[in-house]
């Protein structure tokens, strides 16, 4: 068992972010990492942030810390050893479930003067490797080195085998472009050149800092973007009352502006992410905020100060903007005091802000040295495909595939942002079907930076060239006039581009129905030669493993032959994404314990699938618990190689599949990726109309990998 104790050198070093980033880096490498904070420094009834965020982000087992009050009492009574024994007991309770435990040390402050001494004793008690977590300034290496030196001697100094390295957080003095926020862990962001240069400067004051004796395991830049609170978070800070909360939980404050002059001189401040602060009597500011919102500019919110809240008649006049989610707060504080309180607002991540925590976690993990990480882990640990590792592999495979993906909903804001992310990070070459000026307008309103090589095609300029090919593809089922009319739909137009091999895949559905996305694919792309139907799978990202669920979106009631085909398609999809498939054909009974048409269908489908693909590990009928829970599987199907170990679940009908997928997703708080369509000649994928930007990015990545998989399959078929 490996234990790494994270020791902060002071307040404000980003200790929570450091712990979560290290856990995520381990998780992406298939190492199951747990978290422990033995000693609480929170007040009674306060929730520990790191513990809570770890539980949310990794669905990990947590234990209650020893209360701050109890720590003080024990130390006052001279019972330090007993306190450490209790910490060891808690550690052993958690450690049984993990390969590595990340332990958060005490924060040295004026109240807890004993923190550093107790941290040193804790390191010995847990036999832990120590990582110092500190801020840094590349322009002031002397101060940085002295701060590290001052803490090292408590842990045996540089020569101690216990000291594993230093993680520099919130590093000042680095170029602004080094603070990119990745979609998943991205080792290419690690600042190797900057670390080498900084190490040389540090070694003028401490010859071991930045060497193999005391390595710098990460130089994490300061990021303004990651320090931004939600509009929701400021209400208590400014003693505000909500006039309209709107989208305050989702909007973030990138900047704040105090409006004091005439409105015509302040209009340039009404931009995406801006928090507008103004006296309540300034109805012109309220109206300008409403107009900006109506024009598609997502302001962070509006804070009205002093006196009474605005007249209800004025608010009624602004109803259109209010319905679009504009958050509006009122505070009795004056304007200057409001602005000052916001300026003094801390960088801590609230326990319920999992979106920001996820971004910070990915950001920090990308700057951690994976070679150092691997050197700290016992060689006997068996890597697993965790959700983090799956998403990381997803992005890396799509980058390697270098595919062209067309996005028919080209001016839809989430799609534009997803395309910009994919293009800038090399996930795919994205093609937006939309008027270029419309895309530019969306990007400007939303603060999206469009990459220079992002391709935007005006549908009106290319439609006519697809009329004749479309008539030919439909084999006389429509004439040129009908083809021209159907091509007004950009989904049909994008599907024609795919049919003619001008792109490698298509993603749609942010504003279109599933039928709108899938129907043109059935008509123009058709099924692959080996298949008679199209089905779908969801990748279910459970805490310890990735499951594949099929079919949960397309086929209402497949017969035995079709069910066997869905199983084979799903197994091949699993393989394409690095999952070694163990396929369970799900039914309400296991083996021969039940009877009836539904059970017989599943049994027959299992036999057909085994005959067609003897290379696959398939079993059924199996109940869900017999397929997924090892103890139940051993009891109900002791001779099965799949029972209790299944990772691909094939449901007998759409009702069962869709219900199970949604129940697992909601009740277990499981992230899902999909649906991914399978069985088509070329990849087409449908989005949920409530899809987030990250959902669209991952679907684009899925589509790119599918395109590469199909290309490899065709090449293999030709070779044989």
Swiss-Prot record:
Does this UniProt record's set of keywords contain Transferase?
Answer: yes
Give the disulfide map: none
The alphabetized UniProt keywords are:
Acyltransferase, Cytoplasm, Transferase
Taxonomic lineage is: Bacteria, Pseudomonadati, Pseudomonadota, Gammaproteobacteria, Moraxellales
Please give the name of this protein. Answer: Phosphate acetyltransferase
Species of provenance: Acinetobacter baylyi (strain ATCC 33305 / BD413 / ADP1)
Localization in the cell: Cytoplasm
State how it assembles: Homohexamer.
Q: What the protein does?
A: Involved in acetate metabolism.
Q: List the molecular function annotations (GO) for this entry.
A: phosphate acetyltransferase activity
């Amino acid at each position: 068992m490996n234990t790494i104790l994270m020791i902060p050198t002071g307040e404000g070093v980003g200790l929570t972010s450091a712990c979560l980033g290290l856990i995520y880096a381990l998780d992406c490498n298939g190492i199951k990492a747990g978290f422990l904070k033995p000693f609480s420094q929170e007040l009674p009834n306060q929730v520990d942030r790191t513990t809570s965020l770890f539980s949310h982000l990794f669905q990990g087992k947590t234990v209650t810390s020893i209360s701050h009050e109890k720590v003080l009492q024990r130390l006052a009574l001279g019972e330090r050893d007993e306190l450490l024994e209790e910490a060891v007991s808690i550690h052993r309770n958690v450690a049984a479930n993990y390969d590595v435990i990340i332990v958060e040390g005490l924060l040295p402050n004026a109240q807890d003067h004993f923190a550093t001494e107790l941290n040193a004793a804790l390191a010995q008690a847990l036999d832990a490797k120590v990582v110092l977590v500190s801020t840094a300034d590349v322009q002031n290496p002397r101060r940085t080195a002295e701060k590290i030196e001052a803490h090292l001697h408590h842990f045996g100094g540089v020569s101690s085998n216990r000291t594993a390295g230093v993680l520099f957080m919130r590093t000042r003095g680095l170029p602004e472009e080094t603070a990119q926020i990745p979609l998943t862990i991205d080792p290419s962001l690690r600042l190797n050149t900057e670390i080498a240069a900084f190490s040389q400067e540090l070694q003028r004051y401490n010859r071991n800092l930045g060497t193999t004796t005391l390595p710098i395991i990460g130089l994490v830049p300061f990021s303004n973007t990651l320090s931004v609170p939600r509009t929701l978070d400021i209400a208590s800070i400014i003693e505000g009352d909500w006039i309209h909360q709107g989208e305050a939980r989702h909007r973030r404050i990138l900047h704040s502006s105090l409006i004091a002059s005439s409105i015509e001189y302040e209009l340039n401040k009404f931009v995406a992410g801006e928090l507008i602060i103004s006296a309540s009597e300034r109805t012109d500011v309220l109206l300008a905020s409403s107009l900006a919102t109506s024009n598609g500019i997502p302001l962070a919110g509006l804070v009205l100060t002093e006196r009474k809240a605005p007249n209800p008649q004025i608010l009624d006049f602004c109803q259109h903007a209010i319905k679009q989610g504009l958050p509006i707060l009122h505070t009795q504080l004056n304007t200057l005091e409001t602005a000052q309180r916001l300026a003094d607002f801390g960088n801590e991540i609230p326990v319920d802000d999992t979106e920001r925590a996820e971004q910070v976690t990915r950001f920090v993990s990308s700057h951690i040295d994976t070679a150092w990480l691997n050197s700290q882990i016992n060689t006997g640990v068996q890597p697993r495909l965790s959700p983090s590792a799956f998403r990381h592999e997803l992005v890396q495979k799509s980058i390697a595939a270098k595919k062209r993906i067309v996005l028919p909903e080209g001016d839809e804001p989430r799609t534009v942002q997803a395309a910009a992310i994919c293009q800038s990070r090399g996930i795919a070459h994205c093609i937006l079907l939309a008027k270029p000026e419309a895309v530019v307008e969306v990007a400007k309103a939303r603060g999206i930076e469009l990459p220079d090589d992002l391709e935007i095609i005006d549908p009106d300029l290319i439609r006519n060239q697809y009329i004749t090919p479309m008539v030919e593809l439909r084999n006389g089922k429509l004439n040129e006039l009908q083809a021209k009319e159907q091509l007004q739909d950009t989904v049909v137009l994008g599907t024609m581009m795919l049919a003619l091999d001008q792109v490698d895949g298509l993603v749609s559905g942010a504003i279109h129905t599933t039928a709108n996305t899938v129907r043109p694919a059935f008509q123009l792309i058709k099924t692959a030669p080996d298949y008679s139907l199209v089905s779908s799978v969801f990748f279910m990202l459970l805490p310890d493993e990735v499951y594949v669920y099929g079919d949960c979106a397309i086929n209402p009631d497949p017969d035995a032959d079709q069910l066997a085909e869905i199983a084979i398609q799903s197994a091949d999809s699993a393989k394409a994404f690095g999952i070694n498939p163990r396929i369970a054909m799900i039914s309400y009974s296991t083996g021969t314990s039940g009877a009836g048409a539904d059970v017989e269908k599943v049994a027959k489908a299992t036999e057909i699938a085994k005959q067609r693909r003897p290379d696959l590990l398939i079993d059924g009928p199996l109940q869900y618990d017999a397929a997924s829970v090892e103890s139940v599987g051993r009891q109900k199907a002791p001779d099965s190689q799949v029972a209790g170990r299944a990772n691909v679940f094939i449901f007998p009908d759409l009702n069962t599949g869709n219900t199970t997928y949604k129940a697992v997703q909601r009740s277990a708080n499981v992230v899902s990726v999909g649906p991914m369509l399978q069985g088509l000649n070329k990849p087409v994928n449908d989005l949920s109309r409530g899809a987030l930007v990250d959902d669209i990015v991952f679907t684009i990545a899925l589509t790119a990998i599918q395109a590469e998989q199909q290309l490899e399959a065709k090449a293999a078929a030709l070779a044989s």
